[in-house]
């Protein structure tokens, strides 16, 4: 008999980050899953993921993880006295979640623990208020995120229409405790690249992590741009206009408020102009940018300064002529604004053939 499976579809960024965090734990613990536009997991992966999240924190992040009592990430998600009940009974029951037509989830199709199992859970519950415990699993509230309460409750519209009144299901309430694992540390805060496609989300965040191994100081614009470029080169797939428009970076920042003298957590959003996204996701354009392999040229494209590519090529041709005549190229030469390998004759010769083609393809792509 084949094992039952759960299909997870993209939703708001907090939910998507929870799914990606779950996948990181499953991958680390060598538990299989399917990922395309949606994610498919075996029901048994739920219990394995709960055991796995503690292992992941200990072995990968080198820190202890907790969801009970006054922990730093999900304060009072459960009480300390409920720890054994949650692990041995509640998470086990989560493996049997099913769609319930009588209950609503605002984020997914709605996966709830069946009523007959809830009755059994109540008998095992270590406390008096079982209905209160379950109510916490069916409503989006402060236990579901760490240190972001003020940011979300004060400006709910900036949180993709998330608010405290919306109902969520037992599975979504569980997935949220994985969301912090999806965020990547940068010099500008922790980031998560979100999109309406789980494979795209998974790939872009992987590429972002790889990019940051080269330099932790890259700004968010460059991290996103480089991730899109890598995706275009490695996947060679076309994305629809709607998908492109909905690629964004969620940024978690800590800001010191001089008035209250407290450090506050805020949520910010970043995306690239649509033309830039369209350009970077074009395989032929991305390949030419990769072949040039010059950050200064990439920065011009990210900034939308396409006409400067013509200017850059003019200085490349002048530099080639100087090198042919064995003339010295000074550090103040205009070409140094565009290239670091400005003394490499063969490189400049190659680039002189690429830049005009790149410029024309960019103009074609954006319809100029």
What annotation goes with each model-predicted range?
Residues 63-223:
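Basic, glycine-/proline-tolerant helical and adjacent loop/strand elements
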Residues 20-25, 176, 249-251, 297:
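Generic hydrophobic, helix-prone segments enriched in Leu/Val/Ile
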Residues 9-15, 50, 56-57, 89, ...:
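Histidine (H) residue identity feature
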Residues 3-4, 195, 262-263:
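N-terminal leader/targeting segments
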Residues 1-87, 306:
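Conserved small-residue
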Residues 211-368:
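Intrinsically disordered, low-complexity regulatory regions
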Residues 29-30, 53, 57-64, 68, ...:
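Short, flexible helical or helix-coil boundary motifs
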């Amino acid at each position: 008999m084949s094992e039952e499976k759960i299909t997870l579809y993209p939703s708001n960024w907090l939910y998507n980050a929870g799914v990606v965090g779950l996948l990181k734990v499953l991958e680390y613990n060598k538990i299989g899953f399917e990922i395309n536009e949606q994610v498919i997991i075996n029901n048994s992966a739920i219990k394995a993921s709960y055991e796995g999240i503690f292992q992941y924190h200990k072995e990968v992040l080198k820190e202890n993880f907790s969801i009970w009592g006054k922990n730093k990430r999900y304060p009072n998600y459960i009480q300390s006295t409920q720890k054994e009940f949650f692990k041995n009974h509640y998470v086990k029951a989560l493996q049997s979640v099913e769609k319930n037509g009588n209950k609503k989830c605002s984020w997914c199709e709605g996966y709830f623990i069946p009523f007959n199992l809830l009755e059994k859970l109540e008998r095992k519950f270590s406390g008096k208020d079982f209905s209160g415990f379950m109510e916490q699993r069916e409503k989006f509230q402060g236990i579901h995120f760490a240190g972001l309460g003020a940011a979300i409750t004060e400006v709910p519209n900036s949180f993709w229409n998330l608010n405290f009144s919306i109902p969520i299901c037992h599975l979504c309430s569980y997935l949220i405790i994985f969301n912090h694992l999806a965020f990547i540390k940068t010099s500008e805060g922790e980031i998560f690249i979100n999109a309406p496609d789980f494979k795209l989300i998974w790939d872009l965040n992987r590429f972002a992590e790889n990019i940051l191994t080269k330099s932790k100081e890259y700004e968010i614009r460059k991290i996103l741009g480089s991730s899109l470029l890598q995706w275009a080169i490695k996947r060679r797939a076309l994305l629809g206009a709607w998908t492109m428009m909905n690629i964004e970076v969620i940024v978690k920042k800590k800001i010191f408020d001089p008035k209250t003298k407290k450090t506050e957590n805020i949520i910010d959003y970043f995306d690239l102009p649509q033309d830039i996204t369209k350009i970077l996701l074009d395989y032929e354009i991305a390949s030419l940018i990769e072949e040039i392999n010059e950050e200064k040229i990439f920065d011009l494209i990210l900034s939308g300064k396409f006409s400067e590519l013509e200017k850059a090529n003019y200085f490349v041709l002048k530099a080639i002529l100087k090198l042919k005549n064995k003339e010295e190229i000074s550090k103040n030469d205009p070409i140094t604004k565009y290239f670091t390998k400005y003394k490499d004759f063969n490189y400049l010769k190659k680039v002189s053939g690429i830049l005009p083609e790149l410029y024309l393809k960019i103009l074609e792509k954006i319809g100029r």
